[in-house]
């Protein structure tokens, strides 16, 4: 099965606690899979790192993320520690752009034996996929503010960015089982195409 390097970035807030438990789960995989070796290395990132060193994403951390097989990222940011322009520390956005992590994939599934949040207890199994590098994210660091009256961020939607996230969504849907209720495989486009030209462009590409 081989060895895999994982850069571990605990970060701020609940990050260290959540990552510590996640590491336990990952390392537990080595027992049932004796040929698997996970080589974990910890790296600094986040608001506390920025406060201590002047950077929220040290070069050493970035290089580690570029050369590993995976990155285990906790959380980053502190409302009391901000950049000079008032925005919060968000090294995860830098990683998105540098590593071109364009697909935000968030699976939602209800497992048997887990107390349901809904009284009806319906079967739940779907994935939310979001484009991670375009839209308003493309305006990060480039917005305009005029005194205390106006602030502007531009939304950017490109054909390349849209085509690849749409393609990824359909490929993922094809790999998964269908919806729990009827077994059908679906991809639903959620946008504001009825109002925004950029979103209408996104929908046009999706429909093509």
Regions picked out by a protein language model, each given a short descriptive name:
Residues 1, 33-35, 100, 121, ...:
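Short, well-ordered coil/turn elements that cap or connect secondary structure elements
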Residues 2-6:
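Extreme N-terminal starter segment of soluble prokaryotic enzymes
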Residues 7-24, 28-33, 148-208:
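Glycine-rich phosphate/diphosphate-binding loop of Rossmann-like nucleotide-binding domains
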Residues 9-11, 43-45, 73-76:
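Acidic/polar N-terminal loop/beta-strand segments that form early-domain functional surfaces
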Residues 35-59:
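N-terminal beta-loop-helix "entrance" segment that forms/cooperates
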Residues 39-43, 106, 188:
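General small-molecule cofactor/ligand-binding pocket signal
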Residues 44-46, 132-133, 191-195:
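Glycine-rich beta-alpha junction loops
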Residues 50-155:
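N-terminal glycine-rich phosphate/adenylate-binding segment common to multiple enzyme folds
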């Amino acid at each position: 099965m081989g060895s895999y390097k994982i850069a571990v970035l605990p970060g701020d807030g609940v990050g260290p606690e959540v990552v510590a438990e996640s590491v336990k789960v990952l390392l537990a995989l080595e027992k049932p899979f004796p040929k698997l070796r996970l080589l974990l290395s910890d790296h600094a990132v986040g608001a506390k790192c920025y406060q201590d060193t002047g950077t929220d994403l040290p070069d050493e951390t970035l290089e580690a993320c570029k050369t590993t097989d995976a990155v285990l990222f906790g959380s980053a940011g502190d409302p009391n520690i901000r950049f000079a322009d008032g925005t919060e520390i968000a090294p995860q956005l830098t990683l998105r752009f540098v590593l071109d992590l364009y697909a935000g994939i968030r699976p939602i599934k209800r497992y048997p034996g887990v107390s349901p949040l809904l009284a009806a207890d319906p079967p739940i199994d779907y994935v939310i996929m979001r484009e991670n590098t375009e839209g308003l994210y493309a305006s990060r660091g480039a917005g305009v503010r005029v005194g205390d009256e106006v602030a502007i961020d531009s939304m950017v939607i490109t054909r390349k960015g849209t085509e690849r996230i749409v393609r990824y969504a359909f490929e993922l849907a094809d790999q998964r089982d269908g919806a729990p209720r009827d077994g059908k495989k679906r991809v639903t486009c959620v946008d504001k195409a009825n109002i925004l030209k950029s979103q209408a462009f996104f929908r046009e590409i999706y429909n093509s």
